[in-house]
Amino acid sequence: KEGLIPLLDKIRAAGRPDLSALEGTYDIDAQKKVQNLLLSYIGFDFDAGGTAESAHPFTATLCRGDIRVTNHYHETHPISSIFSAIHEGGHAIFEQNIDSSLADTAAETVNLMGLHESQSRFYENILGRRPAFWIPIYGKLGGLLPQFKEVPFDTFCRAINDVHPSYIRTEADEVTYCLHIILRYEMEKAIFR
């Protein structure tokens, strides 16, 4: 916390990038196609799972070989569904890659939150926010969301790494996300003293 707050202040003082090129209305069905493109790109096996829409993104393991990824879509904010798809895809890939030799053992249901979140956040933030991740598929993104054809690649990369505090943890950037966790911990600690 002591290091994050001064860093956040420094970033805020530098100003936000111009994100006006991303403004507009984005077709929900097109966003669903983007989700499927991204899930396929990161290795989600559609023969062992599927997708659905929900109010809050989540991944559910119905049984071995049936992992469901859900997402939410905002007509004016496609970046949200893009990163929810990558994040939930990370959860799903983790589940899809539990070795079949572990079937019907306690190890098969290794649903430890730390393991799951490490995988999903690795896909979302370590891979998904790097320009190198997008180079092979950015043109396809523009094919599905025509507005992106007008968005220079560098502008897109700045947009997906923009630091902007949010009241919603799952919509927070990589700097302020940690502050959500710290604040929750401090509140819980104070409640149970």
Report the location of each language-model feature.
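Active-site recognition of the HExxH zinc-binding catalytic motif
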Residues: 80-99, 117-121, 187
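Post-HExxH zinc-binding segment in Zn-dependent metallohydrolases
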Residues: 109-148
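Inter-helical turn/loop segments and adjacent helix faces that build the functional surface
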Residues: 7-21, 99-106, 127-138, 193
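Short helix/strand-bridging catalytic loops that position acidic/His residues to coordinate divalent metals
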Residues: 70-75, 99-112
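Contiguous, non-catalytic segments that form substrate-binding/exosite surfaces or channel walls
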Residues: 1-78
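Secondary-structure capping and boundary motifs in well-ordered enzyme cores
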Residues: 27, 61-65, 74-82, 111-116, ...
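Active-site-adjacent bridging/hinge elements
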Residues: 9, 59-68, 92-100, 153-162
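Long, amphipathic alpha-helical stalk/connector segments used for oligomerization, subunit docking
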Residues: 132-193
